[in-house]
Amino acid sequence: MKLSRRHFMKANAVAAAAAVAGITIPIAVRAATEQSEAIHWDKAPCRFCGVGCGVLVGTQNGRIVASQGDPDAPVNRGLNCIKGYFLPKIMYGQDRLTQPLLRMRDGKFDKEGEFTPISWDKAFDIMAEKFKTALKEKGPNAIGMFGSGQSTIWEGYAAAKLFKAGFRSNNIDPNARHCMASAVVGFMRTFGMDEPMGCYDDIEQTDAFVLWGSNMAEMHPILWSRITDRRLSNSNVTVAVLSTYQHRSFELADNGMVFTPQTDLAILNYIANYIIQNNAVNEAFFTRHVNLRRGVTDIGYGLRPTHPLEKAAKNPGSDASEPMSFEEYKAFVADYTLEKTVAISGVPADQLEALAKLYADPKKKVISYWTMGFNQHTRGVWANNLVYNIHLLTGKISQPGCGPFSLTGQPSACGTAREVGTFAHRLPADMVVTNEKHRAIAEKLWQLPTGTIPEKIGLHAVAQDRALKDGTLNAYWVMCNNNMQAGPNINQERMPGWRDPRNFIVVSDPYPTVSALAADLILPTAMWVEKEGAYGNAERRTQFWRQQVKAPGESKSDLWQVVSFAKRFAVEEVWPEELLAQKPAYRGKTLYDVLFANDVTTRFPLSELAENQLNDESRDFGFYLQKGLFEEYAAFGRGHGHDLAPFDDYHKARGLRWPVVNGKETQWRYSEGHDPYVKAGEAYRFYGKPDGKAVIFALPYEPAAEAPDDEYDLWLSTGRVLEHWHTGSMTRRVPELHRAFPEAVLFIHPQDAKARDLRRGEKVRIISRRGEVVSVVETRGRNKPPRGLVYMPFFDAAQMTNVLTLDATDPLSKETDFKKCAVKLAKV
């Protein structure tokens, strides 16, 4: 194969990106564009993280043969991270599932049987039987679904509609509960609306970046490349990084701070105190646009009610607050002096003061970025609220180059889990099931009888595990996630419920993951561009793609699975007589007829698709299903700050940031001149709140649920690495990525290893109060924990890191704290 100069330059750009991960790109991949005349190219957002990079997908003879960064994509401008360059290979693992598999013995289902191929009809037969039995015997609370921030927008929408409207069960929750729930609740408490007010364009306009619990260099590398360019091109730009251990983002930091776990709360309050004491409050902004409230404290740790920590809490799970004056708030944060904060956090005084001065300087534009370090936190909502406090005190918000920005880890945690509302308490467009008016809006748009949607919040992710274990949740569908590996406290709280003979577990996945192998029925799913899809990224950018290849074997998209399953239920089987009496025309119909084949969702014919355009779902059902569902969903948000563009606009664009009003996207919300919902003369209006004012909360430092003691003498923090994504179910099937980081290791300070007679490369047993795992000692490399803390990634199915973790959650968001538990080490 010969390379032109142009292709040679492209290949070298790819190779340079790969070098960051220590990977050699095969010539065949580097030269993927060489035969571009024979390859068909089309756009799609990347399948991995929440950055939302645009890629060009090359197909040939019904297979994906190449991918490259999309030069017209505003997010990444033609650059991909190393995972993005290997996107084609995630589709073609040797163990790709192509048939439904049921545990069987002697020709029938057996919980202890062997996985046996069956037809889709038989798969849906037994699923329907198990769901109908649970509904009949125990009601809607006995069924549930655990979904995903990786599902497409219409997949999540269809699943939420089936459960909340069809089955009348709010027991549907996404794996975004484990990563973004604290951000959601934090946004809602402070602003009354979810998601960031700024966008990635802030990067090129700011003077300072502050990272709180976010290793962007590895977890959001494309954004990090833009930050790096901004920092190295402008000597006046500053980067501050705060974490419980040193990582690759520290390499660019002007001020890198390692703090004791959980004490970020104290640091945030110290900064607020510094701003007030040094007369750096933006009085004009603060007086006009901010309210103050004192939050309830001692709220527990989201453990089972019988746990001693929950029994001891004065206000378990309370999100109550009361108004307070500025003088009262000033007195509250005054307790967080520099000296006290140094003592609590372990960060040197000069570094803390430099950080506070950065925020306080009225001439400096500042962006705060955070990810799991804030969110996976037993006070994650508080951490989110406290960083908003700093930006609201200084007025550094909703303007180019200024603002707090919660980064997401999954490609559609925003677009699907949050905006669609696949959480157990949410409906589309920030509506909630507990609000009667919101339920009425949903019932009207969905053409349901009044009272169909239950008002009780469903089971969140960790509560689902507990209910399965307790035998109260009996029919359970897990879709597009690997929670048996990714969720907390596996042995004590998850595995028992999955293997309980009272329960029937279904897993939809393209690969035999740990979760799939623990299930009773596995449904093979289409991946990424094997279906038409849409994602929403961290900057409110909604992006579409078309189906580009067919899925292998009998694999079907999650959308097809949800909609097809609805055909198995007559309305009379799931709705009581009082609901049917309101809609007599629905008698004799199925949930498919009512929810997915009604006069709204079927109004776009197949003729809108090009003759040769792949769209397996629409051609199967006989109408443009994705468009019908999207336009129905979009009606929830149009006119009140969640406006989405018409469906067809997204196929033409490289994404649009909502609210999209009169064809124009919004870069910065809540500020005059940028947001169409802010009127002339208002300057700012936080219109999620009735009075248009954001809220500053007084919230204290409170300790972690579990900390080291004499026996379990080390903190354990868990997370990811550059080469692998989440549990590695896709990336570990890419040979190059697997070779680059083949197994998980335990990163430990050299002195901590020496004190335990452990050497680099030796096996080590990590033990918590919940279980133990054997890993390999690593005293060098990219992650450098301080003494007293160890770090372990969770991508390796052979080392089930989450056997160790505690199922403590933020009591307000119900998000798990994967960053803090106590362990001890033993030689193997």
UniProtKB/Swiss-Prot annotation:
Protein EC: 1.9.6.1
EC class of the enzyme, as a word: oxidoreductase
Cofactor: how and how many bound: Binds 1 [4Fe-4S] cluster.
NCBIfam families: NAPA, PRK13532.1, TAT_signal_seq
Gene Ontology biological process terms in this record: cellular respiration; Mo-molybdopterin cofactor biosynthetic process; nitrate assimilation
Organism from which the protein derives: Pectobacterium carotovorum subsp. carotovorum (strain PC1)
Cofactor or coenzyme needed: [4Fe-4S] cluster; Mo-bis(molybdopterin guanine dinucleotide)
Any Pfam family the entry gives: Molydop_binding
InterPro entries: Asp_de-COase-like_dom_sf, CT_Nitrate-R-NapA-like, MoPterin_dinucl-bd_dom, Mopterin_OxRdtase, Mopterin_OxRdtase_4Fe-4S_dom, MopterinOxRdtase_cofactor_BS, Periplasm_NO3_reductase_lsu, Prok_molybdopt-oxidoreductase
PTM annotation: Predicted to be exported by the Tat system. The position of the signal peptide cleavage has not been experimentally proven.
Domain of life: Bacteria
Iron-sulfur found in the keyword field: yes
Encoding gene (name): napA
The reaction(s) this protein catalyses: 2 Fe(II)-[cytochrome] + nitrate + 2 H(+) = 2 Fe(III)-[cytochrome] + nitrite + H2O
Name assigned to this protein: Periplasmic nitrate reductase
Location in or out of the cell: Periplasm
GO annotation, cellular component aspect: membrane; nitrate reductase complex; periplasmic space
Main location: periplasm
Similarity comment: Belongs to the prokaryotic molybdopterin-containing oxidoreductase family. NasA/NapA/NarB subfamily.
Chain positions recorded as substrate binding sites: 794
